[in-house]
Amino acid sequence: MFPSSGIRKLARSEEMFAETHNFIGLAAHVKGSMDADALSDAFDLLLQAHPVLGGHLEQLPDGKWEIVLDDLMHPGIEVVELTGDEPAPPLIFDQTVSLVHLRLTIRDGQAQPTLYIHHSLADGHHQFSLVEELFSTYTDLVTTGTTKPVEVHPAPEPLEVILANRGVEKRTRSGLERLLAAMFVYDLPPSRRAPSDVNPVLPQLVPMAYCTLSEQDTEKIIAFCRANKLGLNSLLSAAVLMAEWNVRRTPNIPVPYVYPVDLRYLLSPPVSATESTNPVGIATYLAEIEKGTDIAELARDINDTYKKDIAEGVIQQSFLHFSPQYVGNPPGLPDVVMFTDNGIVPPLRTPPDMEVAASHGEFYFAVGAGIEIYTSKIFNGQLMIEYHSHGPDREKSVAAIEEQLRAVVARQSGVG
């Protein structure tokens, strides 16, 4: 037996990720060669800088989960070489063994490193910061043969501690109240978010469909937002909701919407990228859409609702009331849309002969059905929408969103 020590128990905001064995992946599509040995060394240094990444979860007698470190060395990166359409071997995630994994896939000479991390340790912002650090260290090693001394970081704090340290307390409203107006009111079709009766023992990849807009079309989307004084997040939210409304073919039923809000820059003092695991709040909106609804007006109402909830402190303390469920749907409520906009992703630092041309996200859950998650980002100037779903019509939903976005592009192209 190797000696182990408990770091801390998972907070309530983190427990749901342990219950569903949820790992998130961020893949980089690389042009140019990649040195596997240097990447391995960079990963080792990342683990040294963030010791909690070398830990695992253990379930306590009361059913709660604890982050535990031991003296076992992390197995390091996994290198997989493939040719043509050869399928990659399945990834095996076990949160009681490891919380982070780095796979370097080399297909016909093209490299794709993917960093996977347990969602209880990091949200997307936190994860991207780790990827930035990994690539920066890799670049130093490849170009100079050395790197700066390792700065060891403490284990990230849960959201609850971050809020308490900043005087954010539970208020009367949770934000869910506005969705109650649609609960047990409508004759609803079968839910796409219905959970499976039997779940896999280990996490499985949630299938994904996606679309990517060109740089030119992405610029027009941004120009449309500027011209109409809209946030990109609000416009993309409106596009997703209008697409969902069209696909559902239930025109008289509103579309409930929940989305995460990064609190790092909304709290005082601000929260650094890796200071907390998942420092987010949850925003809500009930989309009342009808034939002729204008996407800009819908986006403006989403934005106004968001600003009001932020001003009243509702979003900041929402997690003190509830934790959003990724699996299943509240009874009596139309299927909830979940959408995360990651904004404009900055370029990663790389050696001169290497470029990260694109990226994509992956979700792993130990569930067989019920996951419905939209995400978006702008990387290398191109807007990408991803739809992670167990449902049968992923491509249809993505095509409906792309249709909404191309209508915005056409609208902006006709200006002037």
UniProtKB/Swiss-Prot annotation:
Entry-linked Gene3D superfamilies: Chloramphenicol acetyltransferase-like domain, Nonribosomal peptide synthetase, condensation domain
Class in the EC hierarchy, top level: transferase
GO biological processes: lipid metabolic process
Keywords: Acyltransferase, Lipid biosynthesis, Lipid metabolism, Transferase
InterPro entries found in the cross-reference section: CAT-like_dom_sf, PapA_C
Catalyzed chemical reaction(s): 2 a mycocerosyl-[mycocerosic acid synthase] + a phthiocerol = a dimycocerosyl phthiocerol + 2 holo-[mycocerosic acid synthase]; 2 a mycocerosyl-[mycocerosic acid synthase] + a phthiodiolone = a dimycocerosyl phthiodiolone + 2 holo-[mycocerosic acid synthase]; 2 a mycocerosyl-[mycocerosic acid synthase] + a phenolphthiocerol = a dimycocerosyl phenolphthiocerol + 2 holo-[mycocerosic acid synthase]
Keyword Lipid metabolism: yes
Site (Structural role in the organization of the active site): residue numbering on this chain: D123
Enzyme nomenclature, EC number: 2.3.1.282
GO MF annotations in UniProt: acyltransferase activity
Entry annotation: catalytic residues: H119
NCBIfam families, per the entry: PRK09294.1-4
Subunit structure and binding partners: Monomer. Interacts directly with the acyl carrier protein (ACP) domain of the mycocerosic acid synthase (mas) protein.
Function: Catalyzes diesterification of phthiocerol, phthiodiolone, and phenolphthiocerol with mycocerosic acids, the final step in the phthiocerol, phthiodiolone and phenolphthiocerol dimycocerosate esters (PDIM) synthesis. Can directly transfer the mycocerosate bound to the mycocerosic acid synthase (mas) onto the substrate alcohols.
Family according to the record: Belongs to the acyltransferase PapA5 family.
UniProt name for this protein: Phthiocerol/phthiodiolone dimycocerosyl transferase
Organism annotation: Mycolicibacterium vanbaalenii (strain DSM 7251 / JCM 13017 / BCRC 16820 / KCTC 9966 / NRRL B-24157 / PYR-1)
Source organism phylogeny: Bacteria, Bacillati, Actinomycetota, Actinomycetes, Mycobacteriales
